[in-house]
Amino acid sequence: MKRIRQTMRAVVHGSGLRRLTPPQRVTSGTVVLGARHLSKSYGARTVLDDVSLDVRTGEVLALVGPNGAGKSTLLSILTGDTPPDRGEVTVLDRPLAAWSPAELALRRAVLPQSFTVSFPFDVVDVVHMGRAPWAAVDVDVDDDRVVADAMAATEVTALAARKFPSLSGGEKARVMLARVLAQQTQIMLWDEPTAALDIRHQESVLRIARQRAAQGDAIVVVLHDLALAAAYADQVAILSQGQIAAYGPPAEVFTAKLLSDVYSYEVEIVSHPRTGVPLVLPVR
């Protein structure tokens, strides 16, 4: 672990790269990520059509909608991995393109839907990769402690010495989430983080999102499970045919008519008897 950290810092020092100033955290409720009039097409197929939204610190924003609605494309544009045909993404009121990759890596972390690690690294070394952006910053931080905390939060401490390729799909997903947490950014974008997980670990991942939001972070998460979105998200953006059909708190936008129309399948909404959270049930 220390070898990786020392190597990263040696590369920065030896290359003459500019040292970076650590980012200042912003207060809860601040818009840190914005999308304005985003559109994207692939050939004749329009994937996103004039989509705008704001992401605020202290909130979990869930992107939901049926397959092909544009959720992952929207997230990919927000991360900068995919350029929009029209529109603009801003990070902290600056155009996304105005940030260098190194500056951006100190401010936002991305958990992709799929991931590969080409070499048989130990799990702990994979998580340590999340600390790489901080090698260019003069801060007194115990990287080993940050990594240990991230691994404990995602319950992968016992996997530390395992080779990453040997893990199950769910184990890999939790390790990659630990890597994102170890990056310690105030903005996080997660693409279907619960897809490969059992119910206990699905709940655990979304509890982490809520905890990080309570600490002032901004989390954007793509979810298929409407129950998870209703239980853990502060705001939801319901995508349908490349547009935002509704945006707001789950209790306000999860209506039977809207969801039935969006998913082309009749559903009903009932309130959880204990929490009052809306439950979306298919009509059978």
UniProtKB/Swiss-Prot annotation:
- Highest taxon listed in the record's lineage: Bacteria
Q: What's a single GO MF annotation on this record?
A: ATP binding
Kind of enzyme, top EC level? translocase
Q: Where does it mainly reside? A: membrane
CDD domains per record: ABC_Iron-Siderophores_B12_Hemin
What GO cellular component entries does it have? plasma membrane
ABC transporter domain ranges (all copies) = 33-266
Binding of ATP, residues: 65-72
Compartments where found: Cell membrane
Q: How does it sit in the membrane?
A: Peripheral membrane protein
Enzyme Commission no: 7.6.2.-
Q: Does the keyword Translocase apply?
A: yes
Question: Which keywords label this protein?
Answer: ATP-binding, Cell membrane, Membrane, Nucleotide-binding, Translocase, Transport
Q: Name one Pfam family in it.
A: ABC_tran
> How does the record describe its quaternary structure?
The complex is composed of two ATP-binding proteins (HmuV), two transmembrane proteins (HmuU) and a solute-binding protein (HmuT).
Functional note: Part of the ABC transporter complex HmuTUV involved in hemin import. Responsible for energy coupling to the transport system.
Q: What family does the database annotate?
A: Belongs to the ABC transporter superfamily. Heme (hemin) importer (TC 3.A.1.14.5) family.
Name-wise, this protein is Hemin import ATP-binding protein HmuV
To which species is this protein native?
Thermobifida fusca (strain YX)
